[in-house]
Regions:
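Interfacial loop at the N-terminal end of multi-pass membrane proteins
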Residues: 2-70, 133-136
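Structural signal for the C-terminal ends of transmembrane alpha-helices
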Residues: 89-96, 167-173
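Hydrophobic alpha-helical transmembrane segments
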Residues: 4-17, 69-92, 151-171
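Alpha-helical transmembrane segments of multi-pass integral membrane proteins
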Residues: 113-164
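Short, charged juxtamembrane terminal tails flanking transmembrane helices
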Residues: 174-179
Length: 179
């Protein structure tokens, strides 16, 4: 196995490890404060009232944990996500018959969009966490929620493209083996 493939495998394993850490530990820890799920995983978004209620439920300790632990994990995750999944999507597109640098560009763009939205989401969430709940304005919440919902929507687009690529690979393989 080449050094680049080993590096990509390490990124993929690290991505899964960071994700598992968030899902098994930091997200339940935040939810345990009683205000519901963290902003990052609210697929359908949230409004100003929900955001302020969650920030109040977190209290100072929960907001500090979200800022210093969860958001640090969620800074590592999109970097690892981008490296591992853009490579995987480029490989799937190659197996599906899309040759050349175009497949790499498409893969990178498809994966970069939710990655960049995740970074923007994290910045907006960090801004909310560092304010007193009463000082969090509706515009900031709307922006953070917009980033959250678009991140998940664009990640779903990427998964759909990958699934279509896998379907093309399987159909081509079946066509070659069917008499």
């Amino acid at each position: 196995m080449s050094a680049s493939r080993i590096g990509l495998l390490v990124c993929a394993v690290a991505m899964v490890a960071v994700s598992a850490t968030m899902l098994a530990w930091s997200v339940p820890h935040l939810a345990g404060y009683g205000g519901g799920q963290p902003f990052d995983i609210r697929f359908t978004g949230y409004d100003h009232g929900e955001a302020v209620a969650f920030l109040k439920a977190l209290g100072p300790d929960g907001r500090a944990f979200y800022d210093t632990v969860q958001l640090r994990l969620d800074t590592a995750f999109p970097i690892l996500y981008f490296v591992a999944l853009s490579w995987l999507l480029a490989a799937i597109l190659g197996w599906a018959g899309f040759d050349g640098v175009g497949r790499v560009v498409v893969a990178c763009v498809v994966v970069a969009v939710p990655t960049l939205l995740d970074f923007a989401e994290n910045a907006a969430i960090r801004d909310m966490l560092r304010r007193a709940p009463e000082a969090v304005d509706a515009d900031l919440v709307a922006r953070a929620s917009w980033y959250s919902t678009r991140k998940w929507s664009m990640a779903l687009v990427g998964l759909t493209i990958a699934a279509l690529g896998v379907a093309v690979v399987l159909l081509r393989r079946r066509a070659r083996t069917t008499p």
